[in-house]
Amino acid sequence: MKFKHKSVLLHETIDNLNPKDGGLYVDATFGGGGHARYLLSKLNKGTVIGFDQDEYAISMAKESFAKELQVGAEPRLMLVHDNFCHLKENLVELGISDGIDGIYYDLGVSSPQFDQPERGFSYRFDARLDMRMDQSQELDAYTIVNTWSQKELSDVLYKYGDEKFSRQIARKIVDRRKEKPIVTTFDLVDVIKDAIPAYARRSGGHPAKKSFQAIRVAVNDELGVLQESLEEAIKLLKPGGRISVITFQSHEDKIVKKIFKKYSEVEIPRGMPMVPADSKPTLRLISRKPIMASSDELEENNRSHSAKLRVAEKL
């Protein structure tokens, strides 16, 4: 089975990295490798290090990028099976200690992960509740749904899914699991449908969409690891190096925007005649507003509708 995933904002993400021959670049979310392949095509010399916590994605990449993975005087591509929040320690293990020239993120779940029923990400297929991007971790969706308290469930659904019926759904989950465990995705869909009023189910897409998103974010601590990784990535960038981040959820975009703002602005104390050397900004924003998909891409790739790209450069 091929890892078929159409990359979003492909040219915008890589072109804004301003890649240079001989550079060292990190693909923090390798997936199907679409962005990496385009980046490698722009480099006569240079290396891309691809991170992915999904073992399936790594195994597929080893097949489709066999030529680029060949060990030579200067490898074109190196793969790391780990979460992108462990950037520094993995780079050190690879003997890289003098920084990187660029890094990019394509956040969220890839199409193949959604389309594999056994992964339990989608409400479209009946499968055991799972939703783990890293199959080796213990916490899964089944554990959250069947063991977390009603308040914890309600908070997750509201905070990560913007689900306005979070309390009703959490209450219904707790009531239902008292009768028997909620084992599969369809079990959970049935509970959610029962909890949401009929008038609300008739509009706004699938009634389980927001809840499934919220539980997935909680399972993988997506917002926590994103913040941790961005902070680390900015430190690892060499002066002139750039960071590109594609988000699909408002929660993700808020984190990226906040961190970019934190490192690109300086608060000057009142009365101070000049900016102290240690108070100068770390980043320069390449675009004040997020870059969105073109009209052509919106027609070709439905996934691009909610995509936002933010880019910054290390000073």
Curated annotation (Swiss-Prot):
Annotated stretches, region: Disordered: 294-315
Protein location: Cytoplasm
Record's catalysed reaction(s): cytidine(1402) in 16S rRNA + S-adenosyl-L-methionine = N(4)-methylcytidine(1402) in 16S rRNA + S-adenosyl-L-homocysteine + H(+)
Protein name: Ribosomal RNA small subunit methyltransferase H
One cellular component (GO) term of this entry: cytoplasm
Binding positions for S-adenosyl-L-methionine per the UniProt entry: G33, G34, H35, D52, F84, D106, Q113
HAMAP family: 16SrRNA_methyltr_H (MF_01007)
NCBIfam families linked: 16S rRNA (cytosine(1402)-N(4))-methyltransferase RsmH (TIGR00006)
Molecular functions per Gene Ontology: rRNA (cytosine-N4-)-methyltransferase activity
Source organism (scientific name): Lactobacillus johnsonii (strain CNCM I-12250 / La1 / NCC 533)
UniProt similarity note: Belongs to the methyltransferase superfamily. RsmH family.
SUPFAM superfamilies per UniProt: Putative methyltransferase TM0872, insert domain, S-adenosyl-L-methionine-dependent methyltransferases
GO biological process: rRNA base methylation
EC code(s) of this entry: 2.1.1.199
Record keywords, A-Z: Cytoplasm, Methyltransferase, rRNA processing, S-adenosyl-L-methionine, Transferase
Domain of life: Bacteria
Known function: Specifically methylates the N4 position of cytidine in position 1402 (C1402) of 16S rRNA.
Enzyme class: transferase
